[in-house]
Amino acid sequence: MDTSELEAAYRAILELATDPGPGPGPAADGDGEAWRAQDVLAHLVVNDRLLVRAVRSVLDGAARPYDNADAIELARLRELGERLGGTAGLIEALKGSSRELLELAGRLDQAQGDTPLPARIVDGDQTRVDQPLPLAGLLTIQARAHLPMHERQLGELLGRP
């Protein structure tokens, strides 16, 4: 499978995350239930792990469902951020998880990319997808919608819209 679009989306978000810029915006640290920059990075790491599991399952011939529920639980995201040592650790984890996803996705052939997976995607309290999607379609959503959305969000949190 061609991963150039996905790779470009990861490159953009990683460049933003690693650029020190003028300093964080007022919402970078957040409070309570508001997402912070670290929460966005942790979300992307967890989501990558879920996508890696889905891609690997197709490569192994036993397609498993994709559900992003674990990637949106704020307490879990904050615990991951603490465990990885904050922003720097999260950036390194995102580099690794995205590299693994890109490598595995690059091994998919057309038939594997067309494999339908039961998919559930929740955004806040809204269910956006709750139906089977071809694996390639799920990765296209990641490249064209999900990563760019979080790139904008991260830019705002870091004061770099």
PLM regions and their residue ranges:
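An N-terminal domain-cap segment
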Residues: 1-8, 14-34
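Short, contiguous alpha-helical
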Residues: 27-74, 117-161
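Acidic/histidine-rich alpha-helical segments that form the ligand environment
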Residues: 76-118, 141
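Hydrophobic packing residues in well-ordered alpha-helices of helical domains and bundles
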Residues: 3-6, 10, 87-94, 139-143, ...
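Helix N-cap and loop-to-helix transition residues
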Residues: 20-21, 36, 86, 109-110, ...
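Structural signal for well-ordered, non-membrane alpha-helices
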Residues: 10-21, 48-52, 56, 95-109, ...
